[in-house]
Amino acid sequence: MPVLLGIPLLLRFLGFLLVTLFGYLLTFLKKGFGKIAIAISLFLALIIGLNSILVGYLSDISAQLPSDFVQGVQLILPSNALPCFYVILSVKAAIFIFDVKQKIVSYLDWDK
């Protein structure tokens, strides 16, 4: 029973910590550094996420083709064709994301 009496005190303490940490976070985000850090994090997440999605799609496509078709394509394509496709699609995705980065950088312009 004494344990139950300490729960409101524990909840009050955790609430105080949460509000304090949230306040520090908001003061940090009000500064320009917070905005830049969030933009860079989102940019890196876009690059990594889009690249992993494209590689996943390519591996799913190659797994769902009929075996006769796969054997016929393997006679024509070199052994390193799939990694080359990965690189080409990754570069295309990176170019798209760098265009998005330019928009983010123009949003983070210091003169605004």
UniProtKB/Swiss-Prot annotation:
InterPro entries: DUF5455. GO terms for biological process: symbiont entry into host cell. Interacts with G3P; this interaction is required for proper integration of G3P and G6P into the virion. The keyword Transmembrane helix applies. The keyword Cell inner membrane does not apply. It is found in: Virion; Host membrane. This is Head virion protein G6P. It comes from Enterobacteria phage M13. Plays essential roles both in the entry of the viral genome into the bacterial host and in budding process. The formation of the G3P-G6P complex termed adsorption complex is essential for correct termination of filamentous phage assembly.
